[in-house]
Amino acid sequence: DWWNHKGIILNMWEHFQKGVKPHADIPAPAPAKDLNQKWFDPQWRAEYLDWYVAHSSLKADILPVANTQLGPGSLAAILGGVFEGGEDTIWIHPDPDFNDEIVFNPEHPNWILHKELLKACKAKANGHYYVGMPDLMEGLDVLAALKGTDKVLLDTVMQPEVLEQQMQQINDIYFKVFDELYDIIREGDEMAFCYFSSWAPGKMSKLQSDISTMISEDDYRRFVQPFIREQCQKIDYTLYHLDGVGAMHHLPALLEIEELNAIQWTPGVGEPQGGSPKWYDLYKKILAGGKSIMACWVTLDELKPLLDNIGADGVHLEMDFHNEQEVEQAMRIVEEYSFSSPAASKESLSKEEAAATKQKTIIIKSPEAAEDEALKPLFNAIVDGKLEPAVEVTQKAIAEGI
């Protein structure tokens, strides 16, 4: 279980459709009339995402999930920020009337839009795939979207007590918003996030503070760390998005948060992507600190050297896949580490873990030649993205002591 620092997840940021045999006969909706419909019409987006998931590759651990994002940091829009739909994303502009009062209005149209979008997608999914949690964000990043980054940075000096109070207010509202949206999208207790094809067996959240590249370590510990810690204490599974080399000096403060499960590394503009040897020591430090890692935009050529250097436990790989042949190649590489990982011993693999039917890495003990033959159907089922046969073969293998 990757959240518990074991095994490998082989995944990608979102999905690709090229060369993929559809999973269901879902027609594409008529093209959006304009950017407003493309982003802010719940019914149109639900129909589009229904088509999107049906035509996306779901091999390896790529999750069937509808990306319901309403822009990065859409909690700011719920609190009064202004939406603007672009060609490839949604922008959230500061509230022109913001006066430092953090107020949640349950009748705000942007809050109503969040709920209507998720409900429309959930109805369309009908249990066949997950509906992702929007990218709400929190803390300083939300406040910066509401009033402007420069003003927030000034607040760290000019009105730090007010800023601390606002951070707590934003956190309190975050939990209210998160819980209500979770109740819409949940499948049992499980949920998925809109990005990273990321799943958890309970409540999960991606946390961040991109503005932290511009603040000191002391300010981070005052204005960010306590509120991230509170989120980690109240949400079962948490992943911190560490963005850019300018934010690396806050890693010690992150590792101090015992309840934080994992850290995702985004190198930033001008830097090599997440599979580069440049980041091996960073990953080792995070793993040694008791957190799982998520490495992004890893290429096939980088995959084996990365795993050779950092190990194969607690590693979530967001690959740079373009077609299903590349996914299958990566599966074969990862298979070697699943066989050899100490975490894959028979003693450490419970029957319940092996029978898990969601996004848990299926770990197999190192087989002898005869066992290799018996386990071929399992590997083939996983590569083909066929979940139920994979589970069935796993259960049979365990029963036979393979």
Tell where the protein language model's regions lie, with residue ranges.
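Short, solvent-exposed helix-helix connector turns and helix-capping sites enriched
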Residues: 41, 159-160, 386
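Well-ordered mid-protein domain cores that form the structural environment of catalytic cofactors
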Residues: 68-105
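Membrane helical hairpin/interfacial module
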Residues: 32-80
